[in-house]
């Protein structure tokens, strides 16, 4: 219970923990889903668009929590259409186009003069 309350405090929803989930906004449900996944202490998290519906403060909190999780030796796979976030958080990326992986590599090995967005546009023929 303490861990749930700790994460809920970090996400700013501690006062809502006794409310019905059906009354939660999309962002609050997203926060609750993250909390629910973390309290089991997994070594691997798979997240689909985890920043969708989050306000800037909650997004920052989630980024911090993700960085803490990885620094403890854990792994996160997540999908995102916000390439700037991917560039800031990830060491390794895969770009998928029409269901096929068209790039799979370490961000450090990318051309330093090219952003992830530029690489994405090139590989998906949207340049």
Q: Over which residues does each language-model region extend?
A:
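ABC ATPase "signature
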Residues: 104-105
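Conserved ABC ATPase "signature" region
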Residues: 1-16
């Amino acid at each position: 219970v303490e861990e749930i309350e700790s994460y809920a405090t970090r996400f700013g929803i501690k006062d809502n923990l006794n409310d019905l989930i059906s009354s939660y906004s999309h962002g609050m449900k997203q926060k609750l889903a993250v909390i629910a996944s973390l309290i089991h202490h997994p070594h691997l998290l798979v997240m689909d668009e985890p920043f969708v519906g989050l306000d800037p403060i909650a997004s920052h909190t989630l980024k911090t929590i993700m960085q803490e999780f990885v620094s403890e030796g854990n792994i996160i796979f997540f999908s995102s259409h916000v390439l700037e976030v991917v560039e800031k958080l990830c060491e390794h990326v895969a770009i998928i186009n029409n269901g096929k992986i068209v790039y799979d590599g370490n961000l450090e090995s990318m051309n330093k003069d090219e952003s992830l967005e530029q690489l994405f546009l090139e590989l998906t023929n949207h340049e």
